[in-house]
Amino acid sequence: MSSSSASKLLGSVLVFAMISVQIVFIHCVMSLNETNSLNQTNVYLHHICINSQGTYKPGSPYEENLNRVIRAISITISNYGFVHGSNGDAPNTVFGKLQCRGDSYLSKCRSCLTTAFSELRGRCPKNKGRIIWYDNCLLEISPINSLGKIDYEYNFYMYNEKDVNGDTNLFNKNTRALLYRLKEKATSKENNNGKQDLPEIGGKRLGMKMLYATGEKSLRTMKLYGMVQCTKDLSIKDCIVCLNWIIAKLPTCCSNKQGGRVLSTSCNFRYELYRFVKT
């Protein structure tokens, strides 16, 4: 598993990697360009080749089904920024899930899908199961249907290399408060009212709920910016569970740091002392 591309694009330095049968957790140091953070597109973060889900051969039924799923997802991308599709019969069934960041719709979302799938072909050329994260999207491909399920297995975190100045305990407290406030906003009835689940590729397209929120908090002479998001196949109840679980990782990942994020295939959060997303 390599994070060399993340180092080149994000100015990141890989600190350590811990891999077990059940958990994949990557810890990176980030040094983002604050000035261009709102304009960055398709910035690679991390990928996982899931060896336990087997491999396939070029020209096989699995590859044919994979290509059909990706084409269908690309065609079906809408303003909601989420598509889940499947194609084929076992043992060659392929499931694909694309979740774009809440402010990355249509052209940005489709561009991120194209980049992500191309990169996965090179990084995990034979793996049936593979995941890749970009700043603007997540793409998961698997022979296993994970629709509507919280993924506790595949997650990683990154943090800004700069420590905060002053009262670190107060800063950490304010960061937690902002993220939990955004969790409430992302899962509120007001934020999701009327966003009905509609049929997907092949019969069920889910995820017309928002399950996404951004915000800011004034800290005397500076502002703290935050974002939380769940994939739209989760129910509101499961989104709450997922965000509670992932925000609880804050002390482990990012204590005293000026910025940080934790990402899984089901939910994620990020906070910074500069504006990285439209709020």
From Swiss-Prot:
InterPro entries: CRR_secretory_protein, GNK2, GNK2_sf. Belongs to the cysteine-rich repeat secretory protein family. It comes from Arabidopsis thaliana. CDD domains: Gnk2-like. It is found in: Secreted. The keyword Signal applies. GO terms for cellular component: extracellular region. It comes from the Eukaryota. Residues 44-146, 152-276 form the Gnk2-homologous domain. Residues 1-31 form the signal peptide. This is Putative cysteine-rich repeat secretory protein 22. Keywords: Repeat, Secreted, Signal. Its main location: secreted. Pfam families: Stress-antifung.
